[in-house]
């Protein structure tokens, strides 16, 4: 049965306030950037020419209205975005070190994204997508946590491949133990997932990327990607594992790097139009290289969503050996 959407995602949609220099008097300046890992991921999918939609909640405020308009401009179907006048849009303040690595401070007590109820979800979006993508930030608080599980079950019932990116953000969890428990709780439903080499010990008994990926495959996940920062990514499937080197970048801001990689990688899985078990490790390596090219371009600009490159730029980067 043909599906209307290639990827539908559920989760946080927020503002990343990223450093943008200082005033003449030395006060810090911050730039308003649309962000949120699921939407960054969808944007990368859309750059590959595929159809996407987002499910989430924003506040009926200047930030929420800006986010809805930004999603529309990115070609993301916004019918699943709830605009609520009783809560504020979630805000993230990002600080960057000399290597472009980030630390976060959040205004989310509660943020609109945590207040999404299942009765507000357009179930047609769940039933009409090839891939349904989630992160773990919708698992931090109720009612969004229950909504996430209900949405995953519904999408799965209608044949969607379930995609998961834990995207651990320590300040948003009450403690590490709860974070680990809840991030693991979704694994029985997951078909494909991406995690970073800093998250392996949170989701598995292993820190080593290869051991962690093999453990996840053993739990029933069908394809695992472990991002390794500037070193690239490790891809693991039933056909084997392979480390795929990254591209040399002039790093400005790593926000959205993993999201853009995963969106680009998943877009290639969808384009190939095969079941997950049919992919050889050689094919997956090719898709990972495409994803690495997208991520390498993403980190050369500030912000997440708006730093994701056009596909023509990606093809140009892919010519670099």
Segments predicted by a language model, with ranges:
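Glycine-rich phosphate/pyrophosphate-binding beta-alpha loops
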Residues: 16, 90, 136-140, 295, ...
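Glycine-rich phosphate/adenosyl-contacting loop at the front of the ribokinase-like
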Residues: 1-77
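Conserved phosphate-binding/catalytic region of the ribokinase-like
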Residues: 1-6, 153, 209-321
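Conserved beta-alpha-beta core of the PfkB/ribokinase-like small-molecule kinase fold
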Residues: 140-214, 231-232
